Swiss-Prot record:
This is Protease HtpX homolog. PANTHER family: PROTEASE HTPX. HAMAP family: Pept_M48_protease_HtpX. The gene is htpX. The chain crosses the membrane at residues 10-30, 33-53, 145-165, 181-201. It is a multi-pass membrane protein. Mice immunized with recombinant bacteria carrying a DNA vaccine encoding HtpX were significantly protected from challenge with M.tuberculosis, indicating this might be a good vaccine candidate. It is an enzyme of class 3 (hydrolase).
Length: 286
């Protein structure tokens, strides 16, 4: 099995550089003092995101670690797949929510965690669960998780800077040589840029993880079946449209929000389920 971590390491580096440059540039718009503070903040943000990417997603989903006694099937499947891929065993978590979904997080295979919701464990059979876990492990082995978390952090920073720019433009844009027109531009374009970044990074990752996961398990049709069930299950039991969950939606195997909800459409980071299923069925046909 061939993994593709090197290209994603480069993308991660470029995103971190871009996030730092953006923070410093927006700091300059607020004036000299803000520029110095922004530079310090950029360094701190990079360090924090790198070492805490796993904790952010697990905390947002209220995920709890589980032992092999608590989740024997999950442990058995993950151990078999990790051994087959010659990779370390990740930490396993369960999130007690009816919303059917799963995600992986962590900056590298040795610091990875895989989480399933109780909802997905309830609706999938073991063959389908194996396919979903293979998909999530593929994210880990391809180093998708770090780039995804960095992209999410970058999007969050852009949104925060846009909010700061809006308030600064309203209540003090002329102090310390701040440029009110530039602040207004940041406020208007920031949320759009944040959404585009999430979508651009996440959609291509999902197709690749579908393919890599199907090769790892040798069963693309099982993943197609799982995606059908998850898609239907999300319509019946979506995650609540809360900002902290929306910021982690790009990590999930499928969009966790009900179709048509404002937050679900705004933060849609996944390719259409129908397209993913068609690709998997074509893969099964050879």
């Amino acid at each position: 099995m061939t993994w593709h971590p090197h290209a994603n390491r480069l993308k991660t580096f470029l995103l971190l550089v871009g996030m730092s440059a953006l923070i410093v540039a927006v700091g300059a718009l607020f004036g000299r003092t803000a520029l110095m503070l922004a530079a310090l903040f950029a360094v701190g943000m990079n360090v924090y995101v790198y070492f805490n990417s796993d904790k952010l997603a697990l905390r947002a989903m209220h995920a709890q670690p589980v032992s092999e006694l608590q989740a024997p099937a999950m442990y058995r499947i993950v151990r078999e797949l990790a051994t087959s891929a010659h990779q370390p065993m990740p930490r396993l978590y369960i999130s007690d929510t009816a919303a059917p979904n799963a995600f992986a997080t962590g900056r590298n295979p040795r610091n990875a965690a895989v989480c399933c919701t109780t909802g997905i464990l309830r609706i999938l059979n073991e063959r389908e669960l194996r396919a979903v876990l293979g998909h999530e492990l593929s994210h880990v082995y391809n180093r998708d998780i770090l780039i995804s978390c960095v992209a999410g952090a970058l999007a969050a920073v852009i949104t925060a800077l846009a909010n700061m720019a809006m308030w600064a433009g309203m209540f003090g844009g002329n102090r310390d040589n701040a440029n009110p027109f530039a602040l207004l531009l940041v406020a208007l374009l920031g949320p759009i840029a944040a959404t585009v970044i999430r979508m651009a990074v996440s959609r291509s990752r999902e197709y690749q993880a579908d393919e890599s996961g199907a090769v790892l398990t040798g069963d693309p049709l099982a993943l197609a079946s799982a995606l059908r069930k998850i898609s239907g299950g999300v319509q019946a039991a979506p995650l609540p449209p809360e900002p902290q969950l929306a910021s982690q939606a790009h990590l999930m195997i499928a969009n966790p929000f009900r179709a048509g909800e404002r937050i679900g459409s705004l933060f849609s980071t996944h390719p259409p389920i129908e397209d993913r299923i068609r690709r998997l069925e074509a893969m099964a046909r050879g």
